[in-house]
From Swiss-Prot:
Gene Ontology CC terms: chromosome; cytoplasm; DNA topoisomerase type II (double strand cut, ATP-hydrolyzing) complex
Biological-process GO terms, alphabetical: DNA topological change; DNA-templated DNA replication
Underlying gene: gyrA
Organism: Aeromonas salmonicida
Motif GyrA-box: positions: 561-567
Protein name as annotated: DNA gyrase subunit A
One Pfam family linked to the record: DNA_topoisoIV
Length: 922
């Protein structure tokens, strides 16, 4: 026990674990996982190709069963499972996995749909032609050899490849504690980069990138952006976006429907799973606008057809698919490889330099090998040439010898005349054909030639027909050609420039034989591409319904109608889903979407679904990250964010606020706070002002207050009727209880004396605002108007009556007052208001979804204290809920009569306030 105890050495378990783990990790990294930077092959790839080479499984020979190759690999070189080795062979034979296949397979080797290859007993393989370039000169001592796993065989430590395979075919995998992902490239470009580096070894990476533009994936597709490529080539790490090559076009069969055709997929994308994912997104309504999906691919080409619903934008649908599916993927580049048996992150130039250094070593070792072989052969031919020059005495010597050994000894023992050899060696040099192992006493000495035993044996083995004059000439000719070859080989070894010329010529031969001209297609990055460039600018009508459905329609969908017509249906509306917001914008405009919780979101008009008049559109909650219970209440089109412009807010409770437009110039996908609202309050209007505009607030009780948003100014006198006062002296400024809603100290107003106006100074985004109008009896503000020009104010009641009133009829007063009467309404009636010009047109929308477009010139201009005329015929339980001005530029050239409706020809004067709103004809 004591002897045994002395043999046990205590060690620290932490140190032992660390040491053992590092040994294991390096064993896996070097011996199993990482590719070598010189040949770009992992050990299993190298062993597969070597086994096929040893089997004579060449590209120009018959195929052999895959099982035969797998058996040789696992039996001699790679002691792992047969399935792992077969999977390696399968991948080397897949044209969608390898840019340049190294194995030529026959049978089912899988597909881009993820189908598995047939069992190895069914498939057959042989080396691809390009694989010979990886194994070329393997038998010329160009690389080191190492024992196999059991020491019974020798295998190459690296292949003497003529092809820069690491970049050409790429590599990916995971080792212990590290991973790598090197993309494939176009062989022509990589060779061109090598040639440029041979010409000028001081080229920078940026200069190399003029030859090597980027990865070239076997499945094609488009590399979206150069920034990731530049970063990866400079540092060894980066990422690129790979986008499917797709086209949006008109279906040839229908000549009307829009379709998306996908021709090429990103690298390593499973086509079947991609199609399943698209179908799943359509089913879950995460991607809308797709009516049909078909896979029309065959064995030669990929073709996925996506049919687009009528009215939807194919470009928008395609971009949504890029966002939500593997039609666009990220390829992370991590160029890690073994360099001198050490894992190393390498940039583009590092890899090319390592390959060229490997080629210099291979060509040098090959040249040394060929020089040795040439000298050995020339040494024999030199002896034969000397023998032929001394043929008679040599024959006489052989005839008088007792045994072959005696004849050999006599041939070696004396010197012989040089004959023709003297002239040949005088030109090439006495030692040109002298092997390194030759002792000094042999060869030319003192004007004679002393034969070696090898030469003497070759003379004795010479057949008699070689003594003819023709054969004599052939021996001398071969000897001379070997002398020339030796001179060339010596020149290669002596001249680095000539050595690089040899490498250059071999690279040119590889490019000529295997190169192709398909360059990687690299587009501008998504940040550089403006989707607006794909969208035709046009004026459209944007609608937002009560239940949150949004859409846009071309303005040309609505023809002008005579007033009193029933209009044309603008959307498929249920009773509870009437249109709440309607505006006219350009497809390139930005829509600021203001929510019930005082937040603002950004949308481009073209991001909204284009829908027909009968379609509901799409829930805006699918376009914006709205929280539960949050609803969009106001939308505002914006072209640019000027510093001298302001966003003016008005709420239903009469609060107003203005904030610089530039405060909303930085869109966030999650939205930002635009205004703090009191509980129960909501936005009813938002507009753009210049800081000194007139502001008009209209209540649902038919009242209006007009004030200047800027600094104080003297009050204008005005005449008022008894109807204007309505129980209070509304000309008196309400100076008390300003109800400052600001939560951050901004926007508070001091009490001001009578006879001055109170403006609205700019406030921060989170301010609550100040009072704009004093409301009575639960009234609500229904409209915010910023008067521009000399146009009239068009007012419409929910019963379909309306009128135009000149702006001069509305006096400028101070904010915070009750205002003056704008229109007579029923006790429970509501109104809609907008400013118009005589050349404009208006749209009226009802809660039943009916929309009518009529000319402003057909609406009477009358005073404030009147009820108006019939604008739209409403049905039973149908009320007007929206009014929108359409500028002169949208007006139709032709005077189009009412469509899908009737024109009232009876009395068109509104009934007195308080009476029934029925049509007098009824």
């Amino acid at each position: 026990m004591s002897d045994l105890a002395r043999e046990i050495t205590p060690i620290n378990i932490e140190e032992e674990l660390k040491s053992s783990y590092l040994d294991y990790a390096m064993s896996v990294i070097v011996g199993r996982a990482l590719p070598d930077v010189r040949d770009g092959l992992k050990p299993v790839h190298r062993r597969v190709l070597f086994a096929m080479n040893e089997l004579g499984n060449d590209w120009n020979k018959p195929y052999k069963k895959s099982a035969r190759v797998v058996g040789d690999v696992i039996g001699k070189y790679h002691p792992h499972g047969d399935s792992a080795v077969y999977d390696t062979i399968v991948r080397l034979a897949q044209d969608f996995s390898m840019r340049y296949m190294l194995v030529d397979g026959q049978g089912n080797f899988g597909s881009v749909d993820g189908d598995s290859a047939a069992a190895m007993r069914y498939t057959e393989v042989r080396m691809a032609r390009i694989s010979h370039e990886l194994l070329a000169d393997l038998d010329k001592e160009t690389v080191d050899w190492v024992p196999n796993y059991d020491g019974t065989e020798m295998i190459p430590a690296v292949m003497p490849t003529k092809v820069p395979n690491l970049l050409v075919n790429g590599s990916s995998g995971i080792a212990v504690g590290m991973a790598w992902n090197i993309p494939p490239h176009n062989l022509t470009e990589i060779v061109n980069g090598c040639l440029a580096l041979i010409e000028n070894g001081n080229l920078t990476i940026d200069e190399l990138m003029t030859y090597i533009t980027g990865p070239d994936f076997p499945t094609g597709a488009i590399i979206n952006g150069r920034a990731g490529i530049v970063q990866a080539y400079r540092t060894g790490r980066g990422s690129v976006y790979v986008r499917a090559k797709a086209e949006v076009e008109v279906d040839d069969k229908t000549s009307r429907e829009t379709i998306i055709i996908v021709h090429e997929l990103p690298y390593q994308v499973n086509k079947a799973r991609l199609i399943e994912k698209i179908a799943e997104l359509v089913k879950e309504k995460k991607v809308e606008g797709i009516s049909a999906l078909r896979d029309e691919s065959d064995k030669d080409a990929c073709r996925i057809v996506i049919e687009i619903k009528r009215g939807e934008s194919g470009e928008i649908v395609l971009n949504n698919l890029y966002k939500h599916t593997q039609l666009q993927t990220t390829f992370g580049i991590n160029m890690v490889a073994l360099d001198n048996n050490q894992p190393k992150v390498m940039n583009l130039k590092d890899i090319l330099d390592a390959f060229l250094l490997h080629r210099r070593e291979v060509v040098t070792r090959r040249t040394v090998f060929e020089l040795r072989k040439a000298r050995d052969r020339a040494h024999i031919l030199e002896g034969l040439a000397v023998a032929l020059a001394n043929i008679d005495p040599i024959i006489e010597l052989i005839r008088h010898s007792d045994t072959p050994a005696d004849a050999k000894a006599k041939l070696v023992a004396r010197g012989w005349e040089l004959g023709n050899v003297a002239a040949m060696l005088e030109k090439a040099g006495d030692d040109a054909a002298r092997p390194e192992w030759l002792e000094p006493e042999f060869g030319i000495r003192e004007g004679q030639y002393f034969l070696t035993e090898q030469q003497a044996q070759a003379i004795l083995d010479l057949r008699l027909h070689k003594l003819t004059g023709l054969e004599h000439g052939k021996i001398l000719e071969e000897y001379q050609s070997l002398l020339d070859l030796i001179a060339e080989l010596l020149f290669i070894l002596a001249s680095p420039e000539r050595l690089m010329e040899v490498i250059r010529d071999e690279l040119l031969a590889v490019r000529e034989q295997y190169g192709d001209e398909r360059p990687p297609e690299i587009s501008a990055s998504s940040a550089e591409i403006n989707i607006e460039d794909l969208i035709t600018p046009e004026d459209v009508v944007v609608t937002l319904s009560h239940q949150g459905y949004v859409k846009y329609q071309p303005i040309t969908d609505y023809e002008a109608q005579r007033r009193g017509g029933r209009g044309k249906s603008a959307t498929r509306i249920k009773e509870e889903n009437f249109v709440e917001r309607l505006l006219v914008a350009n497809t390139h405009d930005t829509i600021l979407c203001f929510s019930t919780r005082g937040k603002v979101y950004w949308l481009k008009v073209y991001q909204l679904p284009e829908a027909s008049r009968g379609a509901r559109g799409r829930p805006i909650i699918n376009l914006l990250p709205l929280e539960e219970g949050e609803r969009i209440t106001a939308i505002l089109p914006v072209k640019e964010y000027a510093d001298d412009k302001y966003v003016f807010f008005a709420t239903a409770d009469g609060t107003v606020k203005k904030t610089s437009l530039s405060a909303f110039s930085r869109p966030l996908s999650s939205g930002i706070r635009a205004i703090n609202l009191k509980e129960g309050d909501e936005l009813i209007g938002v507009d753009i002002t210049d800081g000194s505009n007139e502001i008009m607030l209209f209540s649902d009780a038919g009242k209006v207050v007009r004030f200047n948003e800027g600094s104080a100014a003297p009050m204008q006198p005005m005449l008022m009727s008894s109807d204007d006062v309505d129980g209070d002296d509304e000309s008196v400024i309400d100076a008390g209880n300003d109800d400052d809603g600001s939560d951050n100290g901004e926007g508070s107003e001091s009490t001001e004396s009578k006879g001055t106006f109170k403006g609205v100074r700019p406030m921060g985004r989170t301010a609550g605002g100040v009072r704009g109008i004093r409301l009575l009896n639960g009234d609500k503000v229904v409209s915010l108007i910023v008067p521009r020009g000399e146009g009239a104010i068009l007012t419409a009641t929910e019963n379909g009556y309306g009128k135009g009133t000149a702006l001069t009829e509305y006096p400028t007063k101070s904010r915070g007052t009750q205002g003056v009467r704008s229109i007579k309404v029923d006790e429970d009636g509501k109104v809609s208001i907008d400013q118009v010009d005589d050349t404009d047109q208006i749209m009226l929308i009802t809660n039943g979804g009916t929309l009518v477009r009529t000319r402003v010139s057909e609406v009477s201009i009358i005073g404030r204290n009147t009820g108006g005329v019939r604008l739209i015929r409403t049905g039973e339980d149908e009320t007007v809920v929206g009014l929108q001005r359409i500028a002169e530029s949208y007006e139709e050239e032709n005077d189009v009569m009412a469509i899908d409706g009737e024109v009232s020809e009876g009395t068109d004067t509104a009934p007195d306030a308080g009476s029934a709103a029925a049509d007098p004809e009824e």
